[in-house]
Amino acid sequence: MSRFVNLEFGGESEDQSWNQKGRLKDEAFYFAEARAAFENGSFESGLRLYSKVLEFNPQNAAAWTGQVRMLIELGEFREARLWADKALERFPHEPELLAAKAVALGRHGDLQGALAFSDASIEERGDTPYVWLARADVLLAREEPRADYCFEKALLLAPGDWFIIWLGARVRHYYEQFVLALKLLQRAVELNAGHFRLWLELGQCQQALGLVGPARNSFTQARQLNPRCQEAATALGHLSGTGLWRRVRGSWLRLFGQ
């Protein structure tokens, strides 16, 4: 429960200040920073930044929803459910908040509750890409084949949007549908080849499928785009170790004929 400490307002309220570039650090500033953190896969930072948004405007429903989504991405499904309940006390008809709670419930094992909240999100005129991605998430948790339609619906609502495609890939990856996740990530890379996170997760899918060479290339691209990406460095180290072991094992088999 440690992430609940100061989660809503991030600590004491502070006066508006200015960043080094002279931009006012207000609600809009922190919301943009939170979105950037989300896009970079920095979910802990995103969680804190959405809290900063609420310091300036506790009625920002998107920031509340953002907090729930960050908790989901961090694998904190129970906390996400509890925080969604708190947010829904303020915004009981917010479609994306209902959808986020549905995902938290589904991943936490409450499949019936997940479907009910997903239904509610759609009934609240929630015709947004995230509502449909959340629906797909719930249906995959329930092992229902209709999930494919929901993915297609989400992508149709945001044509050419790499971010939505990436989110879809993350859902596929969570449910170990690595081939389908790979296809989505390839589309996302075509749209935004300069984003390190896409290359990193592309490499993770390739690695899961045993595609060592392509995975190494993807991790290398991620590292070049973001030299501070420790996940890419660790993955490359792991692949190098795997390659060395294969060479040693091959030599051993050739020497001893086993």
State what each model feature region is:
Residues 8-29:
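TPR-adjacent "capping" and linker segments in tetratricopeptide-repeat scaffold/adaptor proteins
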Residues 8-11, 40-48, 74-86, 108-120, ...:
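Structural signature of tandem alpha-helical TPR/SEL1-like repeats
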Residues 23-56, 62, 66-73, 103, ...:
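Alpha-helical segment of the N-proximal tetratricopeptide repeat
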Residues 27, 61-62, 95-96, 127-130, ...:
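Helix-start (N-cap) detector for alpha-helical repeat units in TPR-like alpha-solenoids
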Residues 103, 130-141, 152-190:
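Alpha-helical adaptor scaffolds
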Residues 137-141, 204-207, 230-246:
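TPR/TPR-like alpha-solenoid helical repeat scaffolds
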